[in-house]
A protein has these predicted regions:
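PLP-dependent amino-acid enzyme catalytic core
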Residues: 1-202
Length: 202
């Protein structure tokens, strides 16, 4: 959106809105980084030949999972039965699933990955049942803009295909309902302001 563009530009960045989908924008940025002296691509999705930086970013996402695990313990929850996490390329989901799979190695929770229906590349890969990546292309129109990614992170896919119990391709109304429920919860629960992508698993 224009507001996001302006906020990023205030930090001194050159910002463009392109008439292409997320995955094509990633390819364009990688090309420009290659052609720029001392250019470095910093991106959380991985592909063959570009794995180191995405793995560092996933480790950062893993810190959030670690903090959540510590809070669960503080509240007396020894092991959650289910863990829901949203996915675009799957980097965050891979980090969360990887962390909790190791934390509860003897009896892992049931992991549920929620994607935007219009960009459900992980769901399609899981449904195919052959362990191979599936790609979704085109505009991938959805209100869950942060999840409108059609090409999985290759590192994450290796984790997710082996540990996730359920993949969900969620229509937009699921995210809209999630936002409403988080913003106006049942009595006693604190309200949470969330965007569409963050609310998708709820």
């Amino acid at each position: 959106t224009q507001t996001r563009l302006e906020n990023i530009a205030k930090e001194g960045a050159q910002v463009d809105i392109q008439e292409m989908n997320y995955d094509d924008c990633v390819r364009l940025a990688a090309k420009e980084a290659d052609e720029t002296p001392r250019g470095v691509m910093v991106q959380d999705t991985a592909w063959d030949g570009y794995e180191e930086i995405p793995s560092w970013i996933m480790q950062g996402y893993g810190t959030m999972a670690m903090e959540a695990g510590e809070q669960l313990k503080e509240y007396g929850c020894e092991r959650p039965t289910h863990i829901f996490v949203q996915a675009g390329v799957g980097s965050l989901a891979g980090a969360v699933v990887g962390y909790f799979s190791n934390l509860y190695a003897d009896s892992p929770p049931a992991f549920v990955v929620v994607e935007a229906e219009a960009a459900a590349c992980l769901y399609k890969g899981a449904a195919a049942g052959d362990g191979q990546i599936r790609i979704v292309d085109g505009d991938m129109e959805t209100i869950m803009a942060g999840l409108a990614c059609g090409e999985p992170n290759t590192i994450s896919w290796d984790i997710l295909k082996n540990h996730v119990k359920v993949f969900i391709a969620a229509p937009d109304w699921v995210a809209a309902n999630g936002m409403r429920m988080l913003g106006a919860p049942i009595k006693g629960d604190a309200p949470v302001t969330s965007g569409e992508s963050g609310a998708a698993p709820f």
